[in-house]
Design a protein with these regions (language model features):
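Catalytic cores of nucleotide-sugar-dependent glycosyltransferases that transfer UDP/GDP/TDP-activated
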Residues: 1-198
Length: 198
């Protein structure tokens, strides 16, 4: 992110100054409280788990999350989550372009957040036409967010720009793969997939 804000696209008019003072510019990565965000002790998840047993117990969290979100319960469904402010910055127009493709066999989609009416309505629309595939939770709940980190397979973070972000860090902590747009702090905290090295 510190490099990005030295460009005209991300610099918001300060790119010249930031570029001139690049040696004094440092990026500081966000962190999370490991006592609060700990699937082994989190009182808000359905079933606690650790690195030793997450393969079995994460499935229980998925089934319970599906039930709570009004989706058919099936541990073999691939569950994608978004926990976000629903705004342009968060890249949700990119999700809109592929939403019908995402709602194919074997995939479910759960969103949690509030924001711009166009995105709130977009997710409500997709829930209406794909009720067995999409759960649009147009509000914020700390408890539901913990349950989503514990129950989803993937957390989608398609932000157009992101100084750092926390969603990807929480997802990693819960063994939920963050799929992020390679920008800002997302690029700083999530290693890019390499098809040759895994």
């Amino acid at each position: 992110y510190a490099k990005e804000i030295q460009t005209p696209y991300y610099g918001e008019g300060l790119d010249g100054l930031l570029s001139a003072r690049w040696q004094s510019l440092w990026g500081i990565v966000n962190g999370i409280d490991y006592e609060v965000w700990n699937p082994a002790t989190d009182p808000q998840v359905y079933k606690n788990y650790s690195v030793d047993n997450f393969r079995q117990l994460k499935k229980i969290n998925k089934i319970e999350l599906q039930k709570e979100c009004g989706l058919p319960q099936d541990e073999n469904q691939f569950v994608i989550g978004i926990i976000s402010r629903l705004t342009d910055q968060k890249g949700l127009d990119l999700v809109d372009r592929i939403m019908n493709d995402i709602c194919c066999d074997g995939v479910q989609f759960i969103v949690l957040g509030t924001g711009d009416g166009k995105y709130e309505n977009m997710f409500k629309y997709y829930q209406g036409i794909h009720p067995a595939k999409v759960s649009a939770n147009i509000y914020y709940s700390d408890e539901r967010s913990h349950k989503m980190y514990a129950g989803c397979d993937v957390m989608l973070v398609p932000s157009r720009f992101e100084p750092c972000g926390l969603t990807q860090l929480m997802a990693l902590r819960y063994g939920t793969v963050p799929v992020v747009r390679e920008t800002g702090g997302l690029a700083d905290t999530v290693e890019a997939y390499n098809q040759f090295e895994g």
